[in-house]
A protein has these predicted regions:
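Short beta-strand->loop
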Residues: 96-106, 123, 149-152, 236-255
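Ligand-binding pocket segment of bilobal, Venus flytrap-like solute-binding proteins
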Residues: 165, 169-172, 176-249
Length: 257
């Protein structure tokens, strides 16, 4: 029978299950590369004596590796970045649904997968990120970009910069909007966004921030930490970019982050 894996964006599973295993080793495949994670791994090993064998790669590389290894894969825990990638792994049948009161008590229902037929949950969320709107503080009024819906409003025609809609960051945003607005309204919203683009989608999130600051467009969409990196940068040119843009965490009066 094909082996499946547990997809966790939380190491709580390791605390609850792997710590009881006879082998004092956990094999972790991770697409996350942050200093906070390093501290978490080190603290876990200090507290339990369990060694973490880690394989680092991007999300696509990890999924491809799991498929190639098949039932021989040594992976115990998988960390992927973004719900869209977790969804893809779930659809590919790579995750083993588990029942864990510890995880279910610690992680809200909106940050974990829907239960499988046996009641097990394929994956749990470990952290969240905000998809924010940046805007030209001179040419755009904050109230015109207070919601995601306004990105598709005709009043913002010709103002929008955004990376490819095929990127998981945007797929997750589109999925969230569809969840709240429904398919018909979200389709109209997406068409409105296309009509509002100042240029064809290109670059990453940092490029959208820079494009707004440079006047190529007036509104951009980015994950919040890209802006935070530029704010903390030692480069004067990065800080100059940040000075030119405002930031909105959309839909604060309703379902936003």
């Amino acid at each position: 029978m094909k082996k499946q894996w547990v997809a966790l964006a939380a190491l709580a599973l390791v605390w609850g299950a792997a710590a009881q295993a006879q082998e004092q080793v956990v094999n972790l495949y991770s697409a996350r590369h942050y200093s906070t994670d390093e501290a978490l791994y080190n603290n876990f090993t200090k507290a339990t004596g369990i060694k973490i064998n880690r394989v680092d790669a991007d999300d696509a590389g990890i999924i491809a590796r799991l498929k190639a290894e098949g039932s021989a894969s040594p992976a115990d825990v998988i960390l992927l970045v973004d719900a869209a990638r977790l969804w893809r792994g779930e659809q590919d049948g790579l995750f083993l649904p588990i029942k864990s009161k510890l995880l279910e008590d610690a992680i809200p229902a909106n940050l974990r997968a829907a239960p499988a037929a046996d009641g097990g949950i394929p994956w749990f969320g470990f952290s969240t990120r905000a998809r924010v709107v940046v805007y030209d503080k001179v040419r755009v009024k904050r109230e015109d970009v207070d919601t995601y819906e306004e990105l598709g409003d005709p009043k913002n025609k010709g103002k929008l910069c955004i990376r490819s809609g095929a990127h998981p960051y945007n797929l997750s945003l589109f999925g969230a909007v569809t969840e709240h607005l429904g398919p018909e309204k979200s389709e109209a919203w997406l068409k409105g966004m296309v009509d509002n683009m100042a240029r064809a989608p290109k670059g990453g999130d940092t490029d959208q921030i820079k494009a707004v600051a440079a006047g190529e467009c007036q509104i951009g969409v980015t994950n919040s930490y890209y802006l935070a990196r530029m704010m903390r940068s030692d480069k004067p040119e990065d800080r100059a970019v940040v000075e030119k843009v405002g930031v909105v965490f959309p839909n604060q009066a309703s379902w936003g982050t």
